[in-house]
Structure formats: C-alpha cells, structure tokens
C-alpha cells in the first residue's frame, strides 16, 4: 500500500525542493512562512505569473508556482546574473524561460521526494501563464496545500494540488 500524502510530507518535500533550487540557481536562501489555511473558494488573491508542472503515477497532481511581477523579475535577474537595472529581466520571453526552468527544477525535486517516499511518479512539461489577476482554483477531488516562501523580501507561493494514484 502506498504511503499517504500527508501535510507534513508535502510541506517538507516542497520546502526542500524550493530551498535547494533557490540556493543552487539564485544563490539565495528561502524561508517557508507559517502554514496558512488554503484560500477559501472565491478567494481573491491574484498573481501575474503562474508556472505549473504536473506529475502522474502513484501520486497525481500539479504544482503551481505563483509569482507577482517583482518576484518574477527578481528570479530572472538572479538566475541570469543581471544587474538590478538591466531591462532584460523584464523581457517576457526571458522571464518565461527563467521561471519555467526554476519551476521544472523545483517540481522535479518535489517529485523525487515523493518517489523516495514510495510514491513513484513522472513529470509533465511545464506551462507558464502570464497575465493580470491570475488565480489558482482547487481541482475537483484534489487535496490542496499552499506553502509560501520569502526570498530577499519577495514572496513565492507554491500551490500544490494532488491525489494518491
């Protein structure tokens, strides 16, 4: 019987994945913020960029990395080693590529920890959506886990929705 997808397993796995990727790619520390209740139905928290990567197998679901514009530009600058005033960090294609790589690596690390816990699964391709007032809604039948991280004064939200396979 496959292990259960507990809140502790999910929070620990995403925290390790985010911390490892940010330390390696951005050379920055991240700090998980205290656990908060998932947003209520109809909640109005919005973002300008959503990066999602799904996974299928003994665990099925999707991880959304949710960023405001300031965080997406910060990630792009740090990953590419750009100066704070370099306009390249605001180029939509450059931001998409940088954040997409961070999302793929982060969810890959998360998936590896699920595999290590006895829940083998594989990743889907990353998807990046950019716009105004973007929201993540709960998928039908999925358990939702929302974990916020702080990095250099910026906030990253990992919105994880999953089901046991």
Can you name each region flagged by the protein language model?
Residues 1-165:
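N-terminal auxiliary interaction/assembly segments of multi-subunit proteins
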